[in-house]
Amino acid sequence: MKDFNYKLVLSYDGTNYYGFQKQLHLNTIQSVLENVLNKITKQKKIKIYGASRTDKGVHASGQVVHFQLPFLIPNDHFQKILNFCLPSDIQITKIILISKEFHCRFQAKSKIYHYVFSKKKLNVFNYRFQVYIPNMDFNKIKEAILFIEGKHDFSLFTSQKSLKNYQRIIFKAFIKETKQKYFLIIHGNSFIQHMIRFLVGFLIEIAQNKKTLSEFKQMLDLKINQKARLLAPAKGLILKKIFY
């Protein structure tokens, strides 16, 4: 029997989910997607593969998943049905019928994440997708974030243990400023668990004069054997785009 491979691009508000990856008895993006797909296709064991295993509370506007079906469904019709059945905080933005060899995780070449800071105190209408921290010197962050670029061993900026290789390449890291917000934009070949949030946490400490630029550079060069401790809040982090 021929299988058809579907690639989905989706957005989600991660506030009410325990991350992307399926976990026993917990509400996750993957479990919701699989349940909805099983229901509308009348299949029993559709397995979804995700390109990025975002943490609890982390958002996405460009997550990519893929799965296989034993039959063909027109893309436009499929997308409308999925979005109708999914909760309002998960939405499919694109469906593509793709080659059977495609794997969204293993073939991803790079990813872009944004971390969003508000310049003003948050209110009930905007608190979910950004972070407000008073008394921060963003000029220091603008200088420090450049140190991230290039190839580094990020073992001091992760909670993930026993990896064979902690080296990652950051192609671009910078701040974009608007009237209301600061966006920390990081584009890398791949990321390890909590890496961006630990990096942002250290940048927050630099901006509050609790850490120095020199300490940051030495940690990136592994000249200090002290792990980053401040994990930036999950709600400020957004997976923006995945490149193939």
Curated annotation (Swiss-Prot):
Database matches in InterPro entries: PsdUridine_synth_cat_dom_sf, PsdUridine_synth_TruA, PsdUridine_synth_TruA_a/b_dom, PsdUridine_synth_TruA_C, TruA/RsuA/RluB/E/F_N
Record note on quaternary structure: Homodimer.
Disulfide bond annotation, renumbered to this chain: none
Record field: catalytic activity: uridine(38/39/40) in tRNA = pseudouridine(38/39/40) in tRNA
Catalytic residues in the record: D55 (nucleophile)
Domain of life, per lineage: Bacteria
NCBIfam families recorded: hisT_truA (TIGR00071)
Alphabetized SUPFAM superfamilies for the sequence: Pseudouridine synthase
Assigned protein family: Belongs to the tRNA pseudouridine synthase TruA family.
Pfam family, one: PseudoU_synth_1
Gene Ontology biological process terms in this record: tRNA pseudouridine synthesis
EC number: 5.4.99.12
Free-text function comment from the UniProt entry: Formation of pseudouridine at positions 38, 39 and 40 in the anticodon stem and loop of transfer RNAs.
Alphabetical keyword list: Isomerase, tRNA processing
GO terms assigned for molecular function: RNA binding; tRNA pseudouridine(38-40) synthase activity
Protein name in the entry: tRNA pseudouridine synthase A
Residues annotated as binding substrate: Y113
